Amino acid sequence: MARIAGVNLPAQKHVWVGLQSIYGIGRTRSKKLCESAGVTSTTKIRDLSEPEIERLRAEVGKYVVEGDLRREIGIAIKRLMDLGCYRGLRHRRGLPLRGQRTRTNARTRKGPRKAIRK
């Protein structure tokens, strides 16, 4: 089991799929990382040699991933809330940000229905 960016990658999966278990790396970026590190993307993680793992670590290190990315996103949201702009207010109230309707739907963002007292 290889450890990259503080994440244990699942040994039985292909490299490009396993890299996606790192927060901030999706399909496209994982394939590009494999290409730039010179690793075949369909190789299983358990079959990687130590130099290949080191090259992948170096390539992943060039990006903001995991805790640093989560922190950056949190800071950006906090900044919006402190500014008092529309998006910040929507974050604060736990409502959708991008113009979706809220009279019906938006249950994921708003949470479960609250019972109305009579």
Swiss-Prot record:
Domain of life the protein comes from: Bacteria
Regions that span the bilayer: none
GO CC terms in record: cytosol; small ribosomal subunit
Keywords: Ribonucleoprotein, Ribosomal protein, RNA-binding, rRNA-binding, tRNA-binding
This protein's record includes keyword Nucleotide-binding: no
HAMAP family assigned: Ribosomal_uS13
Function: Located at the top of the head of the 30S subunit, it contacts several helices of the 16S rRNA. In the 70S ribosome it contacts the 23S rRNA (bridge B1a) and protein L5 of the 50S subunit (bridge B1b), connecting the 2 subunits; these bridges are implicated in subunit movement. Contacts the tRNAs in the A and P-sites.
Name of the protein this chain belongs to: Small ribosomal subunit protein uS13
Organism: Xanthomonas oryzae pv. oryzae (strain KACC10331 / KXO85)
Encoding gene, per UniProt annotation: rpsM
